[in-house]
A protein has these predicted regions:
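Beta-strand-rich N-terminal accessory domains
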Residues: 2-81, 229-230, 234-250, 258, ...
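Extended, loop-rich substrate-binding clefts of extracytoplasmic carbohydrate-active enzymes
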Residues: 27-29, 100-152
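Asparagine-centered strand-capping/turn motif at beta-strand->loop junctions
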Residues: 46, 160-166, 306
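Extended, compositionally biased flexible segments
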Residues: 66-116, 128-129, 295
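Acidic/His-leaning functional-site neighborhoods
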Residues: 109, 215-289, 294
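Exposed beta-sheet edge/beta-hairpin loop segments within beta-rich domains
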Residues: 140-142, 150, 286-297
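Hydrophobic core residues within well-ordered beta-strands of beta-rich domains
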Residues: 146, 156-158, 298
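Active-site/ligand-binding surface loops and adjacent short beta/alpha elements
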Residues: 169-171, 175-253
């Protein structure tokens, strides 16, 4: 078993956490830095901008679990299209200031690697802390600490810990905006959301109750409220199911853009690349946003595992 996460602890950084036999620090032509991970259980890549897990594949899996656009833009200050972008401290548009970027700033801010360890089985735990900058202080006026623990092995586990360092409560929205790699969006289904109420963005935020498994034949963008259970992504083409387990989350978002919207993004290409992805997002959004009291910590956890179909 991998060691328990230390996301809620205050850690002193290791002298040089980058010096680990399973870890390699690389820099691309645009100056973005990544951690390439190759341990006995899995391979992965994490961008230090946004502490963004862009790739993860267990060594028992025939196909990558996460989808990464062939047309992703690797530029400072811009989110990478694919993997697991972090949405924080708001989800979607900012509630009062339309000039601020969608989904918050955590995914485009530099993070610091504090600590690296490995279990006896080879699974790795990496702990990151978001760097506070003048830009983060401009967008969020109260003090906080944001720490992400990433555990990489046969399963991918994420623990995002928000600590309120202010003298008053504050409210956050948050999500792991996870892009999953699928054989063909038209042939997969999602179970675990039956009987949940959702807000349908495609239909003007109409509220409905979900009946049955989710299948996809057009643009799909639904926010499932008051949901804290597992979801299963069933993919007969890849002969697998991906299980999404979570805690500290009362919202699940399911999104796939379909052709017109995908082509309009600018970083998903103009072909059919969009057919190979679906987002299933562990979140706290809309009326499920989280109130954090002074000196308290809220942890958002998601865990992904691959099972034979």
């Amino acid at each position: 078993m991998p060691p328990k996460p230390l996301a809620t602890e205050i850690l002193q950084p290791q002298a040089d956490p980058y010096q680990h036999p399973y870890l390699k620090l690389v820099t691309d032509e645009n100056g973005l830095r990544y951690l390439d991970i190759d341990n006995p259980k899995a391979t992965a890549r994490i961008a230090l901008q946004g502490a963004h897990v862009v790739q993860w594949q267990p060594k028992t899996a025939a196909q990558p679990v996460l989808w990464l656009s062939d047309h992703a833009r690797y530029v400072a200050g811009r989110s990478i299209r694919g993997g697991v972008p972090l949405c924080w401290p708001w989800f979607g548009a900012h509630p009062t200031d339309s000039t601020l970027c969608s989904h918050g700033f955590a995914r485009v801010i530099p993070w610091e690697l504090l600590h690296v360890s490995a279990s006896e089985t080879g699974a790795m735990r990496l702990i990151f802390q978001m760097q506070v900058t003048p830009e983060t202080e401009r967008q969020l006026s109260y003090p906080f600490r944001l720490v992400l623990t990433v555990t990489i092995g046969n399963r991918l586990k994420l623990d995002l810990a928000t600590t309120n360092l202010a003298h008053h409560p504050f409210v956050i929205g948050e999500a792991y905006h996870t892009y999953f790699n699928v054989s063909d969006i038209a042939n997969v289904s999602v179970t675990g959301l039956e009987d949940c109420m959702y807000s349908d963005k495609v239909m003007g935020y109409a509220r409905q109750i979900e009946h049955g498994a989710l299948c996809f034949e057009r643009e799909f963008d639904r926010v499932f409220l008051h949901h804290n259970g597992d979801c299963i992504l069933n993919d007969p083409g890849y002969q697998r199911r991906i299980r999404i387990s979570k805690s500290g989350s009362n919202t699940t978002v399911v999104w796939t853009p379909w052709a017109d919207k995908a082509h309009a993004t600018g970083d998903m290409g103009t072909g059919d690349e969009w057919r190979r992805m679906v987002c299933i997002e562990t979140a706290n959004a809309l009326e499920n946003m989280v109130v954090i009291n002074p000196n308290k910590t809220h942890v958002l956890t998601a865990e992904y595992s691959v099972e034979a179909l």
